[in-house]
Amino acid sequence: MCHAAPARPEGARGRPPSGDNFSGAARSKPVGAAFEQRARQFLERHGLGFVAANVTMRGGELDLVMREPDGMLVFVEVRARRSTRHGGATASVGWRKRRRLVAAALQFWSRHGAGAACRFDVVAFEAGRLAWLRDAFRTDDA
């Protein structure tokens, strides 16, 4: 199956402080979509083909599903943080999140990619920089 590898002052519009991440109900979806689009473009420039985005399966959501030229499915989690404090974007993919990603990926894989190898990557935006972690974790890590 799958394997291979401080608060700030209020904003100009009177918004409450958002901390050091990009969370916030009013902004989370558009901000997340923008980072997912940037991640997709980056991965496409590096030879991966787009398969699907924001796939909701029982147990979790897959931000991006891509395909390597050799046919391998790549399940991509996109994370963004303003700073690397508290571990940054990469560290925010903890064991609970990995477990949900694996559950969703197994369902997607069984419906759309059975027989293809697959892996889990993370594209992290931390303090304005993009980091691509290929084979960030495996199914037995979750």
Swiss-Prot record:
Family designation: Belongs to the UPF0102 family.
SUPFAM superfamilies: Restriction endonuclease-like (SSF52980)
Name recorded for this polypeptide: UPF0102 protein Bcen2424_0290
Pfam families in alphabetical order: UPF0102
Signal peptide: none
Chain residue ranges for the region called Disordered: 1-27
GO molecular function, one term: nucleic acid binding
Biased composition range(s): Low complexity: 1-19
InterPro entries: Restrct_endonuc-II-like, tRNA_endonuc-like_dom_sf, UPF0102_YraN-like
